């Protein structure tokens, strides 16, 4: 069974979300997603400062099996990207919830309540696990 940490939020598209600051979240793909993809060979991420919209694509993960779109779990601005993935994209496979993170998204600091609201619309670990068995 895939590793599904209970302290994260999830999307049905297999992204995980961790609150990393008052107005910032860190985003990655789940253990299930990296396992289904196989060996990751390239990750395309937006540049810092790019606006992303919840539910819309922000990049791609390319593996030896396929290319998969990445979807923003919340709307905001890219505040950081994991530049380590440029040289070692396989971090997504070896440590999807740690060193293999993708990017940080920052919401408007004057609207932190919107971040709280957005997080409540995401799946918790139990609900995400349920999507994998359907």
From Swiss-Prot:
This is Glycine cleavage system H protein. The modification N-acetylserine is found at residue 2. Binds 1 lipoyl cofactor covalently. PROSITE patterns: BIOTINYL_LIPOYL, LIPOYL. The modification N6-lipoyllysine is found at residue 65. The lineage of its organism: Bacteria, Bacillati, Actinomycetota, Actinomycetes, Mycobacteriales. HAMAP family: GcvH. Its cofactor is (R)-lipoate. One of its GO terms (biological process) is glycine decarboxylation via glycine cleavage system. GO terms for cellular component: cytosol; glycine cleavage complex.
